[in-house]
Amino acid sequence: MRVLLLGSGGREHAFAWKIAQSSMLEALFIAPGNAGTRLHGKNIQLDPLDFQAVKSFVLENNINMVLVGPEEPLVKGIQDFFLSDTELKNVPLIGPDKIGAQLEGSKDFAKKFMFRHNIPTAKYATFTKDTLVNGYSFLEAMK
């Protein structure tokens, strides 16, 4: 199996370490990777947010599976991009679609989801720089 792992953090290092142990692995590419990931596969200069570049790499290198580590490509819709592309839709990409990724990528979205579905969670409110005074009041009320 030929695997492309997107990301450059500690999470991706752990993924690379474990994937490299598989007897099914033919090649592991990590984009962009880090000093630790290079011990387990080949780091490549590829921006995980450049979906067209990811597509080209997947097709040119006969990638069988893509694993997305960081939230940002998922929140920006890389899974949706793969599923809507006729050349990529049969290449498994591990990670949620854009809407599902919002649960991790947006705390405001996640909290609203939890309240809407009666999932126990701590009290919260969302503030901006324009409503900072309201934020201070909210925090004072939490004491």
What are these regions (language model features)?
Residues M1-I99, F109:
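ATP-binding N-terminal substructure of ATP-dependent carboxylate-amine bond-forming enzymes
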Residues L4-L5, N90, G105-K143:
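Active-site nucleotide/adenylate-binding loops and adjacent lid/helix of ATP-dependent enzymes
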Residues G100-E104:
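Short, small-residue-enriched loops and turns at beta-alpha junctions
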